């Protein structure tokens, strides 16, 4: 049976990738359908109740700068906000928020239900309609066919999902949800490279059974940070603390004594788990010299008693989970509400993707989220936004777009995935970016909002606020440049008290702000340089741009040099064995990867600068390079 409407873009899956993909496509004016197996789970936080963190918060800010939903949702659902690395430089500062799961999910659903150009439909997808290597639509479990010009798959851990608790296993996409078996089988028929990954979640605890009097409280920041560039502290619900406890030698003894009942150590689980979020049994065995691990006790919301013990993800049997939990301080009488478990699922080698998230083998088919081997809500949201945008552009027969590595962490993400692939769940860190001084949380809008507006992702309200911020910054910098003080000026004594060494020559406000000991707040407290900007975001930008001007200029110069051949196209049908001078190893890697540009080719492991030079000569020879460009 054929559905009575045709769509421009279909998004399959309503998690963090799917919601951003559907909204991005709809925001650009394309008729979009979001298919989910259960509308009640739209925007559900399947694992930890938190958004942000090192590297991850940067992605959330970038998604927000391009009109995405995640930052606004957490601003309305966050019950504790903190700035991580607050004492360090601006490049590595990151925002993190605990979420009320129910508030977060409700905000996402409300936003989706009221989004123009977006239709929701509850049905699991079992098959793709593919004709002559181009996707034409999907077929649902009940046999209903939907046609579209582009399809985005954001299926999370549902493809061939298998849940493990001890030596028992069952099929499932997550606890309480069925897996997607038919679609997994269908995708395995297509020419994609497929493998298995694993992730896990800890048992949930009833807060009424915990003795908080012996636990260390961890409070959020005051004033609370805000995630969205459109956000406000008044959007935040009531703020509450988290708590800290620790495992101990008794905990570790319980784990060691029961490893034979662990599906990981019994060889039942074959998928590789996340390196930076290991299970408690993995931590105990890998770090045998440590007799204690810190566990963060995170409330799941304002209207529930459930607690999320961050740090004891496990797939050990339930009776062992009870022993582990009750061995920890404050948890001696703890009641487990939901058992922890591990889940194995299919993922597809992201080297089979273009930089637009379109698959190389099926035109119009896009992948986003855990299907690409990533882990984390934030990584999923970033991929979803870009895949939804590019599916929209594809449906309009327009050229796709993806940010470069020097423009966004979203660019680092797709570049890493599509050039290097991954053998384990990929997580974003600031250390993955070569130009992280330019890719700060605070300037995500300055980097991306103008381009997002051009692409149709940014509405008038966000655009107006962005332009007001730019105006405020420019006017304030001009004011500080043109305001001077000299050793004879009124107020010099007050100024000198703020300086390490007294001022001995005339200086502008910008000159003084460049001094390491001087802050914008201190400078504008002086009568000569008052008043300070009311726009705190613009004020922060003024201070960072002035203080780090030299370093920023140096990184920009480095980027300019490295971009000479970044976008030089490589023919899709080029047989690299025809290129004289390339080694057999390089030929094999290039023929396998089929990189779209020289820049992408240069980042494939084993591709040397000499090989890139040979490719430049070959491109000139076949007329795809302008004379002199190979020496540019």
From Swiss-Prot:
Keywords: Cytoplasm, FAD, Flavoprotein, NAD, tRNA processing
Protein known as: tRNA uridine 5-carboxymethylaminomethyl modification enzyme MnmG
Cell location: Cytoplasm
Gene3D superfamilies: FAD/NAD(P)-binding domain, GidA associated domain, C-terminal subdomain, tRNA uridine 5-carboxymethylaminomethyl modification enzyme MnmG/GidA
Native source species: Vibrio vulnificus (strain CMCP6)
Main function: NAD-binding protein involved in the addition of a carboxymethylaminomethyl (cmnm) group at the wobble position (U34) of certain tRNAs, forming tRNA-cmnm(5)s(2)U34.
Pfam families, per the entry: GIDA, GIDA_C_1st, SAM_GIDA_C
Quaternary structure note: Homodimer. Heterotetramer of two MnmE and two MnmG subunits.
Primary localization class, coarse: cytoplasm
């Amino acid at each position: 049976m054929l559905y009575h409407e045709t769509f421009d873009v279909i998004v399959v899956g309503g998690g963090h990738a799917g919601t951003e993909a559907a909204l991005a496509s709809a925001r650009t004016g394309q008729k979009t359908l979001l298919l989910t197996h259960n509308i009640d789970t739209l925007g559900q936080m399947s694992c930890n109740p938190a958004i942000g963190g090192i590297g991850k918060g940067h992605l959330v800010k970038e998604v927000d700068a391009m009109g995405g939903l995640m930052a606004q949702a957490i601003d309305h659902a966050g019950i504790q906000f903190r700035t991580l690395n607050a004492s360090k430089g601006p490049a590595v500062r990151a925002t993190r928020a605990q979420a009320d799961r129910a508030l977060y999910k409700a905000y996402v659903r409300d936003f989706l239900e009221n989004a123009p150009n977006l239709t929701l439909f509850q049905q699991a997808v079992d098959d793709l309609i593919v004709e002559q290597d181009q996707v034409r639509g999907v077929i649902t479990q009940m046999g209903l066919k939907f046609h579209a010009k582009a399809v985005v798959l954001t299926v999370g851990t549902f493809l061939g999902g298998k849940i493990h608790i001890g030596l028992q296993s069952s099929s499932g996409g997550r606890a309480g949800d069925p897996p997607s078996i038919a679609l997994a089988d269908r995708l395995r028929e297509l020419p994609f490279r497929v493998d298995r990954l694993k992730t896990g979640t800890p048992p949930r605890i009833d807060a009424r059974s915990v003795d908080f009097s012996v636990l260390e409280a961890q409070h959020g920041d005051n004033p609370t940070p805000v995630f969205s560039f459109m956000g406000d502290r008044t959007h935040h619900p009531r703020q509450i603390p988290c708590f800290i406890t620790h495992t101990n030698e008794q905990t570790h003894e319980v784990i060691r004594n029961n490893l034979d009942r662990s599906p990981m150590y019994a060889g039942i689980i074959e998928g590789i788990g996340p390196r930076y979020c290991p299970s408690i049994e993995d931590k105990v065995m890998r770090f045998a010299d440590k007799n204690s691990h810190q566990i963060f006790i995170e409330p799941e919301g304002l209207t529930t008693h459930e607690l999320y013990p961050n740090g004891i993800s496990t797939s050990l049997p339930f009776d062992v989970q009870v022993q582990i939990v009750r061995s920890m301080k404050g948890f001696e009488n703890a009641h487990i509400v939901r058992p922890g478990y591990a889940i194995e699922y299919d993922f597809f080698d992201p080297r089979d993707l273009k930089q637009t998230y379109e698959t190389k083998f099926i035109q119009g088919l896009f992948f986003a989220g855990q299907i690409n081997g990533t882990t984390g809500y934030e990584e999923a949201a970033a991929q979803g936004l870009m895949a939804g945008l590019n599916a929209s552009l594809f449906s309009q027969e327009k050229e796709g777009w993806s940010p470069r590595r020097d423009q966004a962490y979203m660019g680092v993400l797709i570049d890493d995935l599509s050039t290097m692939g991954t053998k384990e769940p990929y997580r974003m860190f600031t250390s993955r970016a070569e130009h992280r001084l330019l890719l700060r949380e605070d300037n995500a809008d300055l980097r991306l909002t103008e381009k997002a507006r051009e692409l149709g992702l940014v509405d008038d309200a966000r655009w107006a606020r962005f332009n007001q911020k730019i105006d405020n910054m420019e006017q304030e910098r001009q004011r500080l440049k043109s305001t001077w003080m000299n050793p004879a000026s009124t107020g010099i004594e007050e100024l000198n008290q703020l300086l390490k060494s007294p001022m001995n020559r005339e200086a502008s406000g910008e000159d003084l702000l460049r001094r390491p000991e001087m802050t914008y707040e201190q400078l504008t407290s002086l009568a000569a340089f008052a008043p300070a900007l009311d726009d705190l975001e613009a004020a922060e930008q003024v201070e960072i741009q002035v203080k780090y001007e030299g370093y920023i200029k140096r990184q920009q110069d480095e980027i300019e040099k490295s971009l000479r051949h970044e976008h030089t196209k490589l023919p899709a049908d080029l047989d690299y064995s025809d290129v004289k001078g390339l080694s057999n190893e390089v030929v094999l890697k290039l023929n396998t990867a089929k990189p779209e540009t020289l820049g992408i080719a240069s980042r494939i492991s084993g591709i040397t600068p000499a090989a890139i030079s040979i490719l430049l000569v070959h491109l000139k020879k076949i007329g795809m390079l302008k004379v002199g460009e190979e020496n540019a």
